[in-house]
Amino acid sequence: MRPQLSDYQHLASGKVRELYRVDDEHLLVVASDRISAYDYVLDSMIPDKGRILTAMSVFFFGLVDAPNHLAGPPDDPRIPDEVLGRALVVRQLEMLPVECVARGYLTGSGLLDYQASGKVCGIALPPGLVGASKFAEPLFTPATKAELGDHDENISFAQVIETVGGVRANQLRDRTLQIYVKAADHALTRGVIIADTKFEFGADRDGNLLLADEIFTPDSSRYWPADEYRAGVVQNSFDKQFVRNWLTSAESGWDRGGDQPPPPLPDHIIEATRERYIEAYERISGLGFGEWIGPGA
């Protein structure tokens, strides 16, 4: 159920976020406690998830120090009290139709592509790699930006050039990798591997490229404990992969290849997911989630 904010016009609902108009140049983005997996929005909420995602994004926007869409602090007076801590005022941008994915390790859809072709997004990789193998250098592996209910598809860099032009494509690749390396280096000092992550970018009225949406959240990134890392095995994680793993387990009873939506998450999976998201934030930021603003604080 989305917040009813009388001062602002509701514009759109995403899998997790609600979008409202503040004025001609600014939007209010509200992160809900919904969780999605395998292109479904699950019939379960993760308590405090929206606040965790917002706290994580705010921390990383400050850390990477890249031009971004933020138009005010997390306690901006334009944010209604009922969504404080899970909402941000941002600049309205023309969003680019590319998911910008940075990968430091072979996992997820990248692993599936490699097993099928020896490549990821058209990039040829050495033979003999296994799940969770670390790349010599991080890869830029873009994807299409799918509509709600559809599936993102990995694409080549040449396809990015066809979509946004050569200059913008190079900007997207270079900015994505620079931001990823800076954040991944920091996380490693905190005992966490950022295996991969995805960004969205938009352009302002002057054509400047700005980092937008969420960054380095447990929804958009894979987080692994560095002290447990070993290539070739399933990694423990502090992210949404924990939910994906349960959905495809015998315990859930769900047939991913069928036409039925996933079942609701049991209480122990909901609580464990919340704990993992909080642990990711606290480990990487060095801050206590109990100190974050908003209802529930």
From Swiss-Prot:
Superkingdom field: Bacteria
One BP annotation, GO: 'de novo' IMP biosynthetic process
GO CC terms in record: cytoplasm
Catalytic function, reaction form: 5-amino-1-(5-phospho-D-ribosyl)imidazole-4-carboxylate + L-aspartate + ATP = (2S)-2-[5-amino-1-(5-phospho-beta-D-ribosyl)imidazole-4-carboxamido]succinate + ADP + phosphate + 2 H(+)
Gene3D superfamilies the UniProt entry points to: ATP-grasp fold, B domain, Phosphorylase Kinase, domain 1
GO molecular function annotation: ATP binding; phosphoribosylaminoimidazolesuccinocarboxamide synthase activity
InterPro entries (UniProt xref): SAICAR_synt/ADE2_N, SAICAR_synth, SAICAR_synthetase_CS
PANTHER family for this protein: PHOSPHORIBOSYLAMINOIMIDAZOLE-SUCCINOCARBOXAMIDE SYNTHASE
HAMAP family: SAICAR_synth
Homology family: Belongs to the SAICAR synthetase family.
Protein name: Phosphoribosylaminoimidazole-succinocarboxamide synthase
Organism expressing this protein natively: Mycobacterium ulcerans (strain Agy99)
